[in-house]
Amino acid sequence: MTRVIVISNLRLAQAFVDYMATHHVALEIRPDAQGVEIWLADDEQLSAVQHELEQFLLDPLNPRYQAASWQAGNVNSNLPYQRFSYLQTLRSQAGPLTLSVMVLCIAIYILMLITGDMAVMSWLAWPYNSSQYLQIWRWVSHAFLHFSLLHILFNLMWWWYLGGQMEKRLGTSKLLVLTIVSAVFSGWGQSLFSGANFGGLSGVVYALMGYVWLTGERAPERGISLPRGLMAFSVLWLIAGYFDILGLSIANAAHVSGLIIGLLMAFWDTRNSARTVQ
């Protein structure tokens, strides 16, 4: 059997299982510390299940899934559903590093609102010159700077979604390494074009996108994935940044550098899995 995914919401998991049953695919639900696991009995059906799962994750509340539950007769099942508050959901889908970085980014953002951007950047921004190179925290701390509410909300949403599942499934140390490496290289890449006047977690976020997506493609048994539709949207967003379509100040070099780092790290980490499949 193959584990397909872990879902925190039992109702959604049951809806997907019922929907796949209408396609003559047998899936099994098992309890998990983070919610429930969905397992597939017939490995030959894995590609079809993954394709349908991508569509499901993009629109899990689509009426066709509820209709499948009615058809299967599981709408009033005796499964022990549990209601979660938003805070419980936030915590259940993230590990200590994911949550700590979120708190740190929010605290720094509030500090920047109180003291001004430059006061905080003077301590945390990418090194301005060689005299600051030995202030090694600067090679990473620039990623925690955000300059607008939309900026920080967008980055933290992706950080929680991608970093949370990576930390839960692969461990805190793996997320820590990717965060540090991508922060350093994305910061270096952006500094070549804009000097030290930049900040934000987006370089790390794009590294996570690349890592989670490619790992899901090459080693789905590791339990992390990013639907191809979301990955395509992220790449289109990256390309749009170069054409200044939205009139926003976007750290394009940091995005590209982060994405490349994430893809390279995922390729390296999954080389044995890909070799086994071949």
Curated annotation (Swiss-Prot):
One of its GO terms (biological process) is proteolysis. The keyword tRNA processing does not apply. One of its GO terms (cellular component) is plasma membrane. InterPro entries: GlpG_N_sf, Peptidase_S54_GlpG_N, Peptidase_S54_rhomboid_dom, Rhomboid-like_sf, Rhomboid_protease_GlpG. It is an enzyme of class 3 (hydrolase). It is found in: Cell inner membrane. The active site is at 202 (nucleophile), 255. Keywords: Cell inner membrane, Cell membrane, Hydrolase, Membrane, Protease, Serine protease, Transmembrane, Transmembrane helix. The keyword Membrane applies. Gene3D superfamilies: 3.30.70.2350, Rhomboid-like. Its EC number is 3.4.21.105. Coiled coil: none annotated. It catalyses: Cleaves type-1 transmembrane domains using a catalytic dyad composed of serine and histidine that are contributed by different transmembrane domains. The chain crosses the membrane at residues 94-114, 143-163, 175-195, 196-216, 224-241, 245-267. GO terms for molecular function: serine-type endopeptidase activity. It is a multi-pass membrane protein. Rhomboid-type serine protease that catalyzes intramembrane proteolysis. Belongs to the peptidase S54 family. This is Rhomboid protease GlpG. It comes from Yersinia pseudotuberculosis serotype O:1b (strain IP 31758). The gene is glpG.
